[in-house]
Amino acid sequence: MAIVKCKPTSPGRRHVVKVVTPELHKGKPFAGLLEEKRKTGGRNNNGRITTRHIGGGHKQHYRLIDFKRNKDGIPAKIERLEYDPNRSANIALVLYADGERRYILAPKNLKAGDPIVSGVDAPIKAGNALPMRNIPVGTTVHAVEMKPGKGAQIARSAGASVQILAREGAYVTLRLRSGEVRKVLAECRATVGEVGNAEHMLRQLGKAGANRWRGIRPTVRGMAMNPVDHPHGGGEGRNKGIQPVSPWGTPAKGYRTRSNKRTDKYIVRRRNK
């Protein structure tokens, strides 16, 4: 995997920095693990915009990823690594000894042909998935469940990881990349190692059109709008007149919006600002 800065042969190429990935599969994805993915344009069933800045973009199939890793005790090997347009991480096609194939998030340093396994007795090795009560304190993991059997929810993007800080009773304490320290049930599963493709953050798209290919539409500043459209709109010259807020008036900087008090007891330390 290498970082390549394109030559300025045109205005659209001048600022492009891309990640070259010769290890990824060049052909089509495995058809048995694809699903139709329909575009919404950011609209709900009433036709109203519920998520701004979404629309257009290239057609994509959704890849069914195995976030549960519940095929215990059956050895498997990485058949190939693939690009996934639906996430920043790459994915790996896994072939199990019984002939079944599944997609998983591609861990760092894993390559085609490497063996992996899931289950309580799995060795502590990158790519293996097991309950966190069986993983030593201090280990770096990813694809962490928040409820046993629900499937991975934490540390799934490119380069993401979580460190196990302690184990006490029915819970383990995790340090997340955000700086938050929280408790999760020790029966929850995690995959050993980090998510691969950490170089994803170094790429530069180089032009607005590259975002349009991805289905991302332009973001207009509130100060450039009229008063009817945004709290920052209108006025003479460039003047907000108020503290920075969202289009709906919620303070945009430093304001706490977390409302799930039921799970506050599991957060040992809030994330770093």
From Swiss-Prot:
GO terms for biological process: cytoplasmic translation. Residues 229-239 have a biased composition (Basic and acidic residues). It holds the Pfam family Ribosomal_L2. SMART domains: Ribosomal_L2, Ribosomal_L2_C. GO terms for cellular component: large ribosomal subunit. InterPro entries: NA-bd_OB-fold (IPR012340), Rib_uL2_dom2 (IPR014722), Ribosomal_uL2 (IPR002171), Ribosomal_uL2_bac/org-type (IPR005880), Ribosomal_uL2_C (IPR022669), Ribosomal_uL2_dom3 (IPR014726), Ribosomal_uL2_RNA-bd_dom (IPR022666), Translation_prot_SH3-like_sf (IPR008991). Residues 222-273 are annotated as: Disordered. It comes from the Bacteria. One of its GO terms (molecular function) is transferase activity. Keywords: Ribonucleoprotein, Ribosomal protein, RNA-binding, rRNA-binding. One of the primary rRNA binding proteins. Required for association of the 30S and 50S subunits to form the 70S ribosome, for tRNA binding and peptide bond formation. It has been suggested to have peptidyltransferase activity; this is somewhat controversial. Makes several contacts with the 16S rRNA in the 70S ribosome. PANTHER family: LARGE RIBOSOMAL SUBUNIT PROTEIN UL2M, RIBOSOMAL PROTEIN L2. Part of the 50S ribosomal subunit. Forms a bridge to the 30S subunit in the 70S ribosome. Belongs to the universal ribosomal protein uL2 family. This is Large ribosomal subunit protein uL2. The lineage of its organism: Bacteria, Pseudomonadati, Pseudomonadota, Gammaproteobacteria, Aeromonadales.
